[in-house]
Amino acid sequence: MYKRQLTDSVETFQEAAQAERDAMMKMLLENGWISKDAAEDVEGHVQEIVEAMHAIMLTSPSLLLQVALVDAVGEKRSQNQPGTSTEYPNWRIPLADADGRVVHTDEVFKSPRVLSMTAVMRGENTRKHV
């Protein structure tokens, strides 16, 4: 695994980040956590991939598992970027779904995407593609 340094170039950082994503996708595909279609069309299968990454946690011996709210609703923007108190509107971005529609607190647990992720974390929806 590549250890990032603050002095690394942007290109080096981007290459390392892409290598990490590629390794994750390869592992998910080779172990049957995602379909071949998902591996070939990541943008069209984001929910399947995110749910698979969470389903893997169920195979660990960990007694405590969690899902970030942004992952559950499909938010694409970062809610917080540490070290950017003036450059980025940390914690002021309204929570939105994968389509950019604002998700209000009373809607969260009615969201089909959240309900699907909840089923994954309960072990009810951990489909493997083998």
Label the predicted regions.
Residues K3-V130:
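Catalytic cores of glycan-processing enzymes that make or break glycosidic bonds
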